[in-house]
């Protein structure tokens, strides 16, 4: 098991910043970080998901246009704590995640990847309580989402 798992392309500044920060954190954290050449070109799906499942934290840097990326949802499903980027690839700050979920989310949001060591210190201090809280929230969110869809479908 590791503290942080990340595998991804360096396609824009936010991902470059994360990659650089991860390289400075090996002394105090067990980190598996892989820079890949392209989408799905870094490792097998099995190895990727085994890395996610074995991690306490999975940084979720911004997608190409908005902060959204499926890595955040993979982290939630793999019971890793995502650290959600609040900036777009162009560096614009967005309160995206609370807007998307329609509520205050239990996972951390970040605007400066240089703050990652401080986030890790807090996460480790509260672990595993924080992952239990997040997992309960995520299961309830999915359940409520399903009920809303069924309610609309059934009229």
Labelled PLM ranges:
Residues 1-104, 109, 137-154:
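Nucleotide-sugar donor-binding catalytic core of glycosyltransferases
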Residues 115-138:
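Conserved donor-nucleotide binding/catalytic region of nucleotide-linked donor-dependent transferases
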Residues 109-115:
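Alpha-helix N-cap recognition
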